[in-house]
Amino acid sequence: MMKSKIKWVLLSLQVLYIPISYSADSLDEIINSHQQEYEQLALKIWDLAEVGYQEYKSSDLLQQSLKNKGFRIETLPYMPTAFVAEYGKGSPVIAILGEFDALPGVSQSTSPFKEKYKNNIAGHACGHHLFGAGSAWSAVTIK
């Protein structure tokens, strides 16, 4: 159930950013070629459940993923877990926001029942684990 929900959310994020010039078949191929990687990345961020401004490991995972795909990464001195990933030069400029922070006090397993997860004190009640991974996946898809 969680895996199909992850795919649906990540794919719906991608629809917002995909150029119209691609055929449906080539888009499916591009999206599917990265599916497993970004589903796993979302689940890793879920497991880490780092609260805002302390999501160092989650930030590192996303940065490394984008760097491996040829993006230039710039970190920000005033917010150490935030970063800008750039690919290419010139126009058009497309900006994609990704969030990956967890919320304190909402630890939850991936089951539909109320089950605290690994005694974590934080959790992803708002789906930011999907938002962060989905935004990175979208950027990789449209580059």
What does each of the following model-derived ranges do?
Residues 1-9:
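Bacterial N-terminal signal peptides that target proteins for export
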Residues 10-17:
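Bacterial N-terminal signal peptides
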Residues 18, 132:
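Alpha-helical and His/Cys-centered functional microenvironments
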Residues 19-23:
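Sec/Tat signal peptide C-region and signal peptidase I cleavage site
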Residues 24-124, 133-136, 141-142:
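Acidic/His- and Gly-rich active-site-bordering loop/insert found
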